Amino acid sequence: MKLIFNLLFLFSAFISQANPQKTGFDKQAFYNAMSSDDLEEINTLLESVKASTLDEKEAYEGALLMKKAGMVSKAKEKISLFKTGRTKLEEAIKKDNTNTEFVFLRLIIQEHAPKMVKYNSNIESDSALIRNNYKNLPSVVQKAIQAYSKKSKVLKALQP
């Protein structure tokens, strides 16, 4: 009986790793969307994140909402999306302030946020945290940081 239970557990773990869509979230797709300017891709991923069962979904949803805010044309919608996204991401960081990936998401947004929204006070400390913890991050996040650092003023081609 114990053998059957262990086999079932291993099989379910394998299936969830082999198919990230089963868990409702694909990190590589998330980072692809964050680096694109495709509103449809952002919207699709937002729906996927909202439907996911991830504990971290608030951070991902917040980052996507703020990214979307920079892509829509109506001022009222921009402000609403940005505020909602900011609240979600900041709450996620507040709950887990050592989560380097969340801090990286905030850095992406802060580095490109208009000055008038006054969302740029953590850039230097976030950059330092990312540099210090880079090697401990999952490879998909490291690759996203590497790609972003080529365009970033504060991460400037972070070396692995």
Cite the ranges covered by each PLM segment:
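TPR/TPR-like (Sel1-like) alpha-helical repeat modules
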Residues: 80-87, 118-136
